[in-house]
Swiss-Prot record:
Naturally occurring in which organism (per UniProt): Litoria peronii (Emerald spotted tree frog)
Entry annotated with the keyword Acyltransferase: no
PTM sites of type Valine amide: V13
Superkingdom to which the source organism belongs: Eukaryota
Family: Belongs to the frog skin active peptide (FSAP) family. Peroniin subfamily.
Sequence intervals crossing the membrane: none
Disulfide bonds: none
Protein name as catalogued: Peroniin-1.3a
Keywords, comma-separated and alphabetical: Amidation, Amphibian defense peptide, Secreted
Main localization (coarse): secreted
Length: 13
């Protein structure tokens, strides 16, 4: 997914 890469943080890291 590109959504997690556009975010500066990871809510599901």
């Amino acid at each position: 997914d590109a959504q997690e890469k556009r975010q500066p943080w990871l809510p599901f890291v």
